[in-house]
Regions:
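Charged, low-complexity intrinsically disordered tails and linkers
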Residues: 16-52
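Glycine-rich phosphate-binding segment of PLP-dependent enzymes
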Residues: 37-101
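PLP-dependent enzyme catalytic core of the Aspartate aminotransferase-like
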Residues: 15-16, 213
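Conserved PLP-enzyme active-site core in the AAT-like
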Residues: 22-29, 35, 61-62, 71-74, ...
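Short, positively charged and aromatic/hydrophobic N-terminal segments
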Residues: 3-10
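Ubiquitous "structural anchor" signal
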Residues: 11-13, 121
Length: 242
C-alpha cells in the first residue's frame, strides 16, 4: 500500500522555500512576519551593541582564566577538609581579576543571593553600627535579615540599626536626604543596582560611582556595598571599577 503524503511531510524539505513561507505553513501570516522583521530591524543597532559588550566581557573572563592558568587540574575533586582546594582558589582568583577586586569569595555553600548579601552584612556590621539604604527598601528577602520585618537572628536583634532614604519621584538618588541620613553611626551603605520587583529604573555604573563618591566625601571610612544582581556584564565596567 502507498501512504498519501500530507502537507506536514514536506515542511522544510524544499530548500527553495523562503523563511516567510515556512512561517505561513506554521500559521504565522505574512503581515505578522513583516511586522516582526520591521521591529527586529529597528533594534538591530541596539542588539549589536549588546553583542559587542558581551564579547568584550567574554574576553575579560578569558584573559583572567589565562592569567590564572585554568586547567583540567582545577576540576579535580579534593579530599579531607578542603584545605588548599586548587580549583576553588583558582576560581576565586579568576573572579577577582575579572571584577578587578582584591579578593573574592565564591563557594558552593552560598546558596543564593540573599545568603551572599547576609554574609557581607553580618561580616561588616557590629552592634551600634547603622546600615543605610540610599536607594529605598531592598529586596523583600532582606527584610528579615536586616530586621525590617521582625526575625530571630536579624541584624536588628544584634543591635544594628537601619535607616532608609527613598528615591525621588523621577527614580534618582535624593542626595540632600542622603547627606542628612549619614551620621557617626553609619558604617555601611547598601546600594541595590537592580530595580528588583519595583518600577524604578535600574542604576548604571556611572550613577553608582557618583553616589559612592558623594557618600565618601561626607564619611570617607564608610563601607559602600553594591548588590550587583542582574547587573554583571551588562556594561564594560562594573561597580567595583568605580
Amino acid at each position: 500500500s502507498v501512504r498519501r503524503r500530507n502537507k506536514s511531510d514536506t515542511i522544510g524539505k524544499d530548500h527553495k522555500i523562503t523563511m516567510k513561507e515556512l512561517y505561513e505553513q506554521l500559521g504565522i501570516s505574512s503581515k505578522v512576519y513583516d511586522f516582526g522583521a520591521e521591529i527586529e530591524a529597528s533594534l538591530k543597532e541596539r542588539f549589536e551593541q549588546f553583542d559587542k559588550t558581551a564579547e568584550y566581557n567574554q574576553l575579560k573572563v578569558l584573559m583572567a582564566m589565562q592569567k590564572n592558568k585554568v586547567s583540567a587540574e582545577c576540576f579535580q575533586s579534593s579530599s579531607g577538609y578542603g584545605y588548599d582546594d586548587f580549583g576553588r582558589d583558582t576560581l576565586e582568583k579568576v573572579y577577582a581579576d575579572t571584577f578587578h577586586t582584591e579578593a573574592c569569595l565564591i563557594r558552593s555553600q552560598i546558596t543564593c543571593g540573599t545568603h551572599a548579601l547576609a554574609i557581607a552584612l553580618f561580616g561588616n556590621l557590629r552592634p551600634g553600627d547603622e546600615l543605610l539604604a540610599p536607594a529605598g527598601k531592598p529586596y523583600d528577602t532582606l527584610e528579615e535579615v536586616i530586621g525590617i520585618r521582625p526575625s530571630r537572628g536579624s541584624l536588628a536583634e544584634y543591635g544594628v540599626t537601619y535607616r532608609q532614604v527613598d528615591l525621588k519621584e523621577d527614580g534618582t538618588f535624593d542626595y540632600n536626604s542622603i547627606r542628612k541620613a549619614i551620621n557617626e553611626k553609619t558604617r555601611l551603605v547598601e546600594i541595590q543596582r537592580s530595580k528588583g520587583y519595583q518600577t524604578r529604573p535600574s542604576f548604571s555604573v556611572k550613577q553608582i560611582g557618583e553616589l559612592i563618591s558623594f557618600v565618601k566625601s561626607i564619611k570617607p571610612d564608610v563601607i559602600c556595598m553594591v548588590d550587583n544582581c542582574y547587573g554583571e556584564f551588562v556594561e564594560r565596567i562594573e561597580p567595583t571599577d568605580v
